[in-house]
């Protein structure tokens, strides 16, 4: 399907362009359970990029769409998405290195309402739940591209994240009931690199969401970026967030058992980076997180996953 290059209605307003020097320092703060200090990356051995000791490299492009933040407890962040316009996304994608990947398979069995809204119209509120990798995924503004591709649908997004955040954090203190349920999302995206193979917590969060919102659809996704070298299939097969590891197999099993969609985002992400013949850090802003180019890889993967004609 050809993705149309015009804006459609979203439930956020346009704002001033963010300062490019701070654009990548968006919420949440750059911290994760999988950090360079805890787990040094082998990618540093041949990296052509010098990262700051603290913080991230300055962004070339900031955000040109104003987002709305909502009250939430300390160290957690809750705000609207997307934060970039189609024009800015196009500029970033035009400049980024071209790569290739095999589109991940899409089984619409447990995402039937989402598919119906995309093709026939209606409201689709997508909520991203997880860590700073989930934040980066939604900062790619893939929802703006999705809205342009399916103009009959009224698509909006919300991001609920914590640095290093996984379901083991969201399951407690009534966080799902206090902060997620009142937003009444239609589709919840649970992903990132910080789940820590806590499968009980993932199941518990799904149950809490479903108890309050029985019609909600849920998409479970494996992780991307972090410190694992995507050029090394053997390392990916051992990574705690990877679609090619036992984590991916278990997450897929949970998705089938609990009637959720499943997305292995790890494999196409690694394929894209390898196909460019560039060092992976060309797509990073620090030792763990994506820069603007890296975020757009995630956007391309998600857009291919939600291709209804496949």
Predicted regions and their residues:
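Oxyanion-hole/transition-state-stabilizing segment in secreted/luminal serine hydrolases
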Residues: 119, 127-129, 139-144, 169-203, ...
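Second-shell loop/turn segments in exported
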Residues: 127-134, 164-166, 192-196, 237-238, ...
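A short beta-strand-loop structural module common to alpha/beta enzyme folds
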Residues: 153-167
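A short helix->loop->beta-strand "cap" motif at the edges of active sites that frequently abuts
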Residues: 211-218
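Catalytic His-Asp segment of secreted/periplasmic serine-dependent ester chemistry enzymes
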Residues: 226-310
């Amino acid at each position: 399907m050809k993705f149309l290059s015009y804006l459609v209605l979203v439930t956020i307003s346009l704002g001033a362009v963010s300062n490019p020097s701070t654009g990548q320092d968006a919420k949440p703060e750059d911290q994760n359970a999988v950090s360079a200090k805890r787990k040094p990356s082998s990618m540093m051995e041949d990296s052509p990029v010098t990262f700051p000791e603290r913080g991230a490299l300055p962004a070339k492009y900031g955000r040109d769409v104003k987002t709305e933040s909502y009250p939430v407890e300390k160290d957690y962040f809750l705000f609207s998405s997307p934060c970039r316009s189609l024009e800015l996304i196009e500029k970033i994608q035009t400049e980024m290195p071209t790569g290739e990947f095999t589109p991940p398979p899409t089984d619409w069995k447990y995402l039937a309402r989402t598919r119906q809204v995309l093709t026939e119209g209606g409201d689709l509120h997508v909520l991203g739940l997880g860590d700073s990798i989930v934040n980066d995924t939604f900062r790619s503004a893939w929802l703006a591209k999705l809205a342009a591709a399916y103009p009959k649908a009224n698509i909006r997004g919300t991001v609920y994240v914590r640095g290093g955040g996984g379901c083991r954090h969201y399951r407690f203190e009534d966080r799902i009931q206090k902060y997620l349920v009142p937003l009444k999302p239609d589709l919840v995206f649970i992903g990132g690199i910080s789940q820590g193979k806590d499968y009980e917590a993932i199941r518990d969060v799904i149950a809490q969401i479903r108890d309050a919102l029985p019609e909600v659809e849920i998409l479970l996704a494996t992780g991307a970026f972090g410190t694992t070298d995507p050029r090394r299939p053997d390392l990916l097969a051992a990574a705690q967030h990877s679609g090619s590891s036992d984590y991916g197999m278990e997450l897929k099993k949970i998705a089938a058992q609990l009637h959720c969609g499943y997305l292995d985002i790890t494999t196409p992400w690694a394929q894209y980076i390898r196909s460019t013949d560039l060092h992976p850090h060309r797509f990073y802003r620090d030792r763990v997180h994506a820069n603007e180019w890296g975020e757009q890889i995630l956007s391309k993967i998600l857009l291919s996953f939600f291709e209804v004609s496949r």
